[in-house]
């Protein structure tokens, strides 16, 4: 079976892992980092994903997209989306009720759905795994916050499809964290484990019982809009006000200044987890004014006090729902980067009467770790004891039901029901001779459907005339292991049925759209590769020209070359160097033809030099005549395919 990876698709950072040879490996990206920023940037020439995108964000804030996870599967008018948009330097517009990101790419305006942006991050994670494993990776388990609703889960699954992945399962982040913790611990008996998962953009708490490899989620709660970024926002606002006070200037209108400040705030926040105070120094932050300031841990804690405090409410709720007293919790496991904040660790510990949280798993990697185990299990990898004995029982995060007369929410599947699950109930008509019923499916905890989230609706028609209350309509809810639902209705008298897979009504991408996006993703990938080749050709020409120049300036070569030849070669090199300075954006072919021309002048001259017994070349080795010495030169230009196109040329002979 092909390898299957576990991907933690985070709001701010993502991480990928694989289970093989009986252990989990978290895979580092091309920059050597084990987590990759969930950033995608669009420039005049190329698309950047991950570290490269985040590194250039200050220069290009309006075309660098992040936090797609805060938009995915949501409606444009959601209060959360509207609130988040205030912090986004990039443009979010509305298209058929959904939030769409608008950027400028290669000089034209482009629109991307949150699914497409997330798929680009997933593609990057997939490529990271492929580079490490040396083969293609198609199968993946992707994690989502436990509190994600049906549309957010579907949209995440779609992002995986656009990235060309076969999504084996969508699993909940705290559950994945629980697997990571539980694999280490082979404790006897049933253990109640509270997973406190606090990342860059979301917050979840789940209570699991772990016994003999069975991981059963008892209850879950959380906030899909609370994370480390909220703390960054508080710091940014604090310093914007301080800057205003000190300098009478408002930098909040300048995207670049805000971005530089935010980057400094993120760094300061991290530093304050280990130091009691830190300083911020940003040169020429806004209108030429330098900004030097400092902040203490105590002040930071005060700025975020209400946010920190709000994390305790879901903890209480999870214990209440699971009907477990806090003294019966055996372990508290911290997952997610924000759990490194000392104040949060202290609050969790105080809540559990001084019990210390377990820090055995790396908070950044725990979720990907658990997802990788689940991926191995689902791809049928039974090679290991660890994967053989695990059974994962998750729960539905929100109650699911239908609307009955008077706009009442009648739940069929209660929150925290173990999934997969199937539940049927019989309903009837509301008025005499009613020919059909409208089945409207909702998720949420409120008593009235108008306060809950409509997932979809369908009609069951052709009910024979009968007094109200006589026809029997059986409604069945079937939730699969991904937390995604099918609903069917059957009229028992006639045997008429109708069903709905909860999909399109709430803005899920259609099959056609996904296929179109897949094709586009391929196109972008090809463009990215072409750009890499172009830069390779440019670098090849540049290093060829400079190494020729170095060779010429070597005294041993200098003595043996004819003055006219030397002059001719020198002027040709200078011409190419000048052309390079003016043509940074030329095509691959143009660079290659320049290189051919330069080789046409250089080769005969250098051949003469070798003919004149140039003692096997200058100390630096003649460029192209082998690997070269210091400043020497591999082949005829790293990307200069010119030398390879038409059979071997002289410089390739070692």
From Swiss-Prot:
Superkingdom classification of source: Eukaryota
Q: Where is the composition biased (Gly residues)?
A: 614-640
GO molecular function list:
ATP binding; ATP-dependent protein folding chaperone
User: By its UniProt entry, which SUPFAM superfamilies does this protein fall under?
Assistant: Actin-like ATPase domain, Heat shock protein 70kD (HSP70), C-terminal subdomain, Heat shock protein 70kD (HSP70), peptide-binding domain
Q: Where is this region: Disordered?
A: 614-654
Any Pfam family matching the protein:
HSP70
Record's Gene3D superfamilies?
1.20.1270.10, 3.30.30.30, 3.30.420.40, Actin, Chain A, domain 4, Substrate Binding Domain Of DNAk, Chain A, domain 1
Q: Which CDD domains match?
A: ASKHA_NBD_HSP70_HSPA1
The UniProt keyword set, sorted, is: ATP-binding, Chaperone, Nucleotide-binding, Stress response
Q: Which family does it belong to?
A: Belongs to the heat shock protein 70 family.
Q: What is this protein called?
A: Heat shock 70 kDa protein
Q: Which gene encodes it?
A: HSP70
